[in-house]
Regions:
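N-terminal capping segment at the start of a domain
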Residues: 17-31
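Conserved, non-catalytic sequence blocks in retroelement Pol enzymes and Pol-derived host proteins
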Residues: 9, 32, 119-122
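Basic/polar N-terminal segments that are highly enriched at the extreme N-terminus
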Residues: 1-12
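Secondary-structure capping and boundary motifs in well-ordered enzyme cores
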Residues: 10, 14, 35-36, 70-71
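Cofactor-binding active-site loop characterized by glycine-rich and histidine/acidic residues
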Residues: 39-139
Length: 139
């Protein structure tokens, strides 16, 4: 009996595209942080595709899992996965990353579908995640 591989060819290709998209968005913007989005591409892909319960058609669904990116400067990790999962994010948002017409440099609640909370200062996401978890207990 052979074990099913952790990553399929499609997974590997999608992770490679995620890394390229992160590098291209930062290069086009002329600023940003490509390292974390590139290094976390595989982990983020597996989380969004295999572990997290969420619905791109209903980002505010109460039964969803919450993803809080505490290191907001690595926002492309989240934006790319939201895009690939089918959330209402245009590819053009990546080409105008960190500009008024594109995706924000840090996750901003209400600006990007699927972003649970605004993060920017390092560590702020931890407090936000605890608050979201406490609130979820009462839903």
């Amino acid at each position: 009996m052979s074990a099913e591989p952790l990553l399929t060819d499609l997974d590997r290709q999608t992770i490679a595209v995620s890394k390229a998209l992160a590098a291209d968005a930062v290069e086009k913007a002329g600023s940003g942080h490509p390292g974390t989005p590139i290094s976390l591409a595989g982990v983020a892909w597996l989380l969004y595709q295999r572990e997290m319960v969420h619905d791109p058609a209903d980002p505010g669904w109460l039964g969803r899992d919450r993803f809080v990116l505490s290191i907001g400067h690595a926002s492309l990790v989240q934006y790319i996965q939201l895009f690939l999962a089918g959330y209402d994010i245009d590819l053009e948002g990546f080409t105008a990353f960190r500009s008024p017409a594109g995706l924000p440099g840090h996750p901003e609640f209400g600006e990007v579908p699927g972003v649970e909370t605004t993060t920017g200062p390092l560590g702020a996401g931890f407090a936000n995640a605890v608050g979201l978890a406490m609130a979820a207990r009462r839903e």
